[in-house]
Amino acid sequence: VNKMKPKALFVMLILWLSFTTIQARSTEDVPDKGTYAKFLLVGCYMKPDEEGVRMYRFDGQTADVDYPCGLRGISNPAFLTSDSTGNRIYAIGDDEGKSSTANALLFDKESGLLSLLNSQSTDGELPIYITLSPKEYFVLTANYKGGSITVFSQDKKGKLQRDTKIIRFAGNGPNKKRQEQSHLHCVTFTPDGKFLLATDLGT
């Protein structure tokens, strides 16, 4: 499948995790460097033995960037999302076969370190997008080559469970080279949380 990928390694989504060291202070206080610190999470097309998820610390006052850590263990974690707290990060494994995965990560705000909680197969090849349900009970992936959406539940610690539900799409489109089958690109909920929307390149 001729799936379009960006030419650069640094990919698709940069998460601005706007937490860290902001504290109440008067307008006369001189802010220290940490006051403006934000974390950037970058997903990359990289092999599992490389740091495909990268954490950068960005200073909003000086625009200085440093690289405190990265995370190995995921094949092509090219799209990331976070929960509402910023403590849990979710990444796709944009690959085929057993390497087609959804991945749950923990982010420690104090240390700025990432850790991999667990990975589960999407049972749909080339997952390209990942999102959370409105109440964050479920994690969903859009699987490009699989032509499907995979729905994962999570336990209280944020680990993805194996009891998946798969929504499969069928059909094709007028461009026989690109639309020979369903190719899911994105899945998201409407603002009221009542409906799930999906975009399909293949039909």
Where are these regions (language model features)?
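Residue-level detector of Asp-centered blade-edge/turn motifs that repeat once per structural unit
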Residues: 34-36, 82-86, 132-136, 191-192
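Beta-rich catalytic cores
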Residues: 36, 49, 75-78, 126-128, ...
